[in-house]
Amino acid sequence: MTLKIGIVGAGGRMGRNLITAVHNAEGVELGAAFERKGSSLVGADAGEVAGIGATGVKISDDLSQNTNFDVLIDFTRPEGTLEHIKFCVANGKKMVIGTTGFDDAGKQAIQAAAEQISIVFASNYSVGVNLVFKLLEKAAKVMGDYCDIEVIEAHHRHKVDAPSGTALSMGEHIAKTLGRDLKTHGVFAREGITGERKRDEIGFATIRAGDVVGEHSVWFADEGERVEIAHKALSRMTFANGAVRAAKWLNTKQNGLFDMTDVLDLNNL
């Protein structure tokens, strides 16, 4: 049976890539596409907006107008995603959430929703990035207590949150491995006379420029040597393909909160 996918933010950069990824994938089809109220794209064919030709799926501005989907993929903004979660819970729809920038209350709302529906919630849907998470845990075990750790990330000028959700996830993987709390050990800005760096800090640096899709590098810097673990995304299709893969994996789950570690079975490496 073909899995039907709904996409919110269908006219955005990520939305168009998601439509293309669904079109190219086996065992799935586009069932619904949505944009914000007032968008000039409402009523347009989603496939034509994405540049793949007509699909017969018209973009709507209201989830209740088209419930022809099993899984909703959401890469929008926290306030919108939280409303979409309410709809999916009420209508028994599964979700793949790639939105970043949630506060603690937003994350708690996602956890609560996962008691009723199945959700994959990840900061990054790239297979490579999720493999990097595991490599960072390995490096932290070996070097973390004896070196300085810095997370450096770069994204396009339109990204609205900083540090990126992926950078924060990298820091969280490292902090958890070292038994540290990122809220107290993370340093997110340095300016002026800061004093010497503390050994147990996990530093973050952010770059916003041009059309950078996404670059992340983590330094484990000791006296006389430095290990760098890096990932560069060259196309948003990397994230879109991963999200569709997550949606297909999620189809067999009735409820629960999962991430790409579960989808890729990385804990069994």
Swiss-Prot record:
The keyword Nucleotide-binding does not apply. One of its GO terms (cellular component) is cytosol. It is an enzyme of class 1 (oxidoreductase). (S)-2,3,4,5-tetrahydrodipicolinate binds at residues 156, 165-166. GO terms for biological process: diaminopimelate biosynthetic process; lysine biosynthetic process via diaminopimelate. It comes from the Bacteria. Its main location: cytoplasm. NAD(+) binds at residues 9-14, 35, 98-100, 122-125. Pathway: Amino-acid biosynthesis; L-lysine biosynthesis via DAP pathway; (S)-tetrahydrodipicolinate from L-aspartate: step 4/4. InterPro entries: DapB_C, DapB_N, DapB_N_CS, DHDPR_bac, NAD(P)-bd_dom_sf. It catalyses: (S)-2,3,4,5-tetrahydrodipicolinate + NAD(+) + H2O = (2S,4S)-4-hydroxy-2,3,4,5-tetrahydrodipicolinate + NADH + H(+); (S)-2,3,4,5-tetrahydrodipicolinate + NADP(+) + H2O = (2S,4S)-4-hydroxy-2,3,4,5-tetrahydrodipicolinate + NADPH + H(+). The active site is at residues 155, 159. Coiled coil: none annotated. Its EC number is 1.17.1.8. NADP(+) binds at residue 36. GO terms for molecular function: 4-hydroxy-tetrahydrodipicolinate reductase; NAD binding; NADP binding; oxidoreductase activity, acting on CH or CH2 groups, NAD or NADP as acceptor. Belongs to the DapB family. Catalyzes the conversion of 4-hydroxy-tetrahydrodipicolinate (HTPA) to tetrahydrodipicolinate. This is 4-hydroxy-tetrahydrodipicolinate reductase.
